[in-house]
């Protein structure tokens, strides 16, 4: 129950303040393999986390051990019988052995930028003449628009008590798309 409350409080906090939202997005950018609700729980407990996994993955696949005294990060999994808690650990909670695998956190290098720009142009029809940052922003705007078009009714039905509730449908859509595009772009560029 305490973890459900933590999730609710954290969601209110990050959606109520721009700087808190950016801080959350920074954490989310490192944890892109996790869904939003897991990213939210990780942010609430360990905003500095950079690479999280279950005990079994660290110990088995990665041949790393969890340091004594390390506190797991609780994640909530809804089941038919209510909420189930599972734990993950950040790489900073682990230690190495002789046969440990390295944890390489992916980063875009300057040398790889031309290849990434070319791939974005070929695979996603991004404007090849744009800089990488501009391509990312262009694609983020497209994704935000596509999401809005697909989920417009659901979004408009859920905006009570939010800033969007004061807008007509057109203005709410424009505001949502702008915020979503900025968030997508921020996560990718962080």
Spell out what each predicted region is.
Residues 1-190:
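N-terminal accessory/interface modules of nucleic-acid-binding and processing proteins
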